[in-house]
């Protein structure tokens, strides 16, 4: 049994095995419909319990299809219907019930502490579907997409992030350290990652550089990532924050500083941080990126169940 909570805590050899398995599984599904089961049904009889404390479209759909295609089933719980939320039941007791009824637990949460507490009391694998500090399933899937399109290992590419510092960027930073790729981050100085993340970068002496100039961050990029400037439940003056990111908006002019074959990726949903003429262009691979979540999350599930070949 293995958990999947934060990329920085998972050996890079395991992360690479997940990517290799996902690549193989995607090839085998070329002629199959969405709900057809993979040969061998490796997770037949297994139940994935999911709980979403934050809104979700891609994570919810992709985990639903992932477990179904592996031959298993899934049940999605709404926190507002549980005693955990309204009846004062403890995480310890809830985790015991989840462990008795299910075979794995996927949590999308507004609390890193809650994620760790569930991990402490569960006797089944736990997967982080998004937390305030990280989004590991998203970034591992994005690495899969980058390597699929570029036909190169990510360690040979120049990766750029332009936008706010958030949980997705934290996981991209962890991936940069794990996979040893160059990462340029373009954001206003005020919106750099937390001191904890900066220390993590410094401790690992990685090829990560910050720029208070979007053009400098984009220069020579093979891939440009972005995310919404106004995140879910972001309690800030929205118009003021958007104004501070004006010079970091991704448009055709900014993309011209990157390599000619640079691709644009965005974890979605989008906001005002990218123009339509980039988001809807041939350089944008956001739909392929979203669909690849299914393939990588299948391999993450197999990893957690100890069934990776």
Label the model's feature ranges.
Residues 30-32, 95, 103-175, 266:
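Anion-binding alpha/beta catalytic cores of soluble intermediary-metabolism enzymes, centered on
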Residues 53-66, 148-226:
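Glycine-rich phosphate/diphosphate-binding loop of Rossmann-like nucleotide-binding domains
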Residues 70, 101, 121-123, 179, ...:
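Short, structured coil segments at secondary-structure junctions
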Residues 280-309:
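C-terminal helix-to-coil terminal segments
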């Amino acid at each position: 049994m293995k958990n999947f909570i934060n990329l920085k805590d998972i050996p890079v050899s395991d992360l690479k095995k997940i990517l290799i398995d996902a690549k193989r599984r995607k090839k085998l599904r070329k002629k199959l419909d969405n709900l057809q089961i993979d040969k061998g049904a490796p997770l037949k009889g297994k139940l994935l319990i999911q709980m979403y404390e934050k809104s979700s479209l891609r994570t919810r759909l992709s985990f639903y299809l992932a477990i179904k295609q592996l031959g298993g089933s899934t049940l999605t719980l709404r926190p507002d219907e549980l005693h955990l939320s309204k009846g004062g039941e403890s995480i310890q007791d809830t985790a015991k019930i989840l462990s008795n009824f299910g075979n794995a637990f996927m949590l999308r949460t507004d609390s890193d502490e809650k994620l760790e507490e569930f991990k402490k009391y569960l006797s089944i694998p736990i997967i982080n579907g998004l937390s305030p500090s990280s989004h590991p399933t998203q970034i591992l899937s994005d690495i899969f997409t980058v390597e699929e399109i570029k036909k190169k290992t990510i360690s040979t590419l120049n990766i750029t992030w332009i936008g706010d510092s958030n949980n997705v960027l934290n996981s991209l930073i962890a991936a940069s350290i794990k996979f040893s790729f160059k990462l340029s981050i373009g954001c206003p100085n005020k919106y750099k990652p937390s001191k904890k993340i900066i220390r993590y970068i410094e401790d690992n002496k990685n090829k990560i550089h910050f720029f208070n100039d979007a053009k400098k961050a984009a220069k020579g990029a093979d891939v440009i990532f972005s995310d919404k400037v106004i995140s879910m439940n972001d309690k800030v003056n929205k118009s003021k924050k958007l104004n501070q990111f004006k010079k970091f908006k991704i448009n055709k002019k900014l993309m011209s500083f990157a390599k000619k074959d640079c691709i644009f990726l965005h974890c979605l949903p989008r906001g005002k941080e990218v123009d339509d003429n980039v988001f809807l262009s041939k350089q944008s691979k956001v739909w392929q990126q979203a669909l690849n979540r299914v393939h990588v999350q299948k391999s993450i599930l197999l990893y957690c169940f100890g069934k990776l070949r």
